[in-house]
Amino acid sequence: MEEEAMHGFTQYTPTMIIFGKETQKQAGELAKSLGATKVFVVYGGGSVVRSGLLDQVTASLQEAGLDYMTIGGVKPNPRLSFAREAVKKSIEFGTDFVLAVGGGSVIDTSKAVAHGTANPETDIWEFWSKKQTVTKSLPVGVVLTLAAAGSETSDSAVLTNEDTKIKRGLSTDFNRPAFAIMNPELTYTLPKYQVGCGVVDIMMHTLDRYFTQTENNELTDEIAEGLLRTVIRNGAVAIKDSHDYNAMSEIMWAGSLSHNGITGLGAEKDFAVHQLGHELSAKFDIAHGASLSTVWGAWAAYVYDAKPARFAQYARRVWNVEEADDVKAAQEGIKKTVAYFASLDMPTSFSEATEIGLKTDEEVKKMAHGCSYEGTRTIGSFKVCDENDIYEIYKLANK
């Protein structure tokens, strides 16, 4: 009997992409064309100030005749407390458009500000804890400075509650930005570590979709495999020279495509590795990309036998593995992926990540308990993992 074909799907990608050099100077006119009058500008650390980017963006807002307010200080693994404070200021300002100038954490915070400003009666954590549903929001624009999360076109956003050390994601079409300005030159100042984290994150957004039990989904598979080959090739260049415009262009565009849904259309998604990583980021404040690279090899080694042929296909098409035996090919593909992460100077186990301090088996069990929402949920679909499976994966990674 024929295997099940691709699943039915709905794909919604309303984000306008403005790609190329000097495009950040169009921010004001773009916001104005979407009806903006009072723009709330969100950014992270001092790099956008030191580089002059923030001045360029605010100048474009002034030239467009728009009123604006800025707020800086977003940190990696965006904090709920900061987002709440930003919402208060945004409401007081009378914001009708939110502009993110930064990477994934800044964009996710901006999405939270947009939801909170449009729903002043609701605490934003209610949306992330799934107690309330987003039914209205403000438009968000993006000036991207970091190729990684893909939040500039995605329907997702994450926040970390520092009080409870819980990191949660929210998926809704209200999260999709109205426009994304993407100038690869804005990534030139990134430290090597952030470039590596970005490459890992981009790969993971596709890998977490690629490893699926869904069969006969040829075009989506080819798109995913092509994206992965492109990122692997250009990531090796960018990690040595982040001023390589061609390499950074390919990586930046791949980051958007990897998380706007296209690399997993028609297939059941897995995303177990992201859930495993979120628990690490929440507890230890490790960079998102690094949290994923520490645990991917352990996850892959634990689950590949649920369908060795899928991992073998990945190994042959992405890594050019010639091994005929599916199990051996699968294992070789996993080794090559982990070795690639290491070549980017990314941690591939907990012991290589200085932020992660799991010293006892009880601590590992506690992490698994948290990741499984205290034993109330499973993660993944390629191989459904319960609390014990999560514990075994963390234990493998804790070497």
Task: Name what the model sees in each region.
Residues 95-111, 145-151, 283-286:
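Glycine/serine-rich anion-binding loops at beta->alpha junctions
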Residues 119-216, 313:
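A glycine/threonine-rich phosphate-anchoring loop and its flanking beta-alpha core
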Residues 56-57, 87, 106-120, 153-154:
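Short Gly/Thr/Asp-enriched flexible loops that form oxyanion-binding sites at enzyme active sites
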Residues 209-339:
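Active-site segments that bind and position negatively charged phosphate/pyrophosphate groups
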Residues 2, 311, 321-399:
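C-terminal charged capping/lid subdomain of soluble metabolic enzymes
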Residues 2-97, 350-351, 378:
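ATP/NTP phosphate-donor binding region
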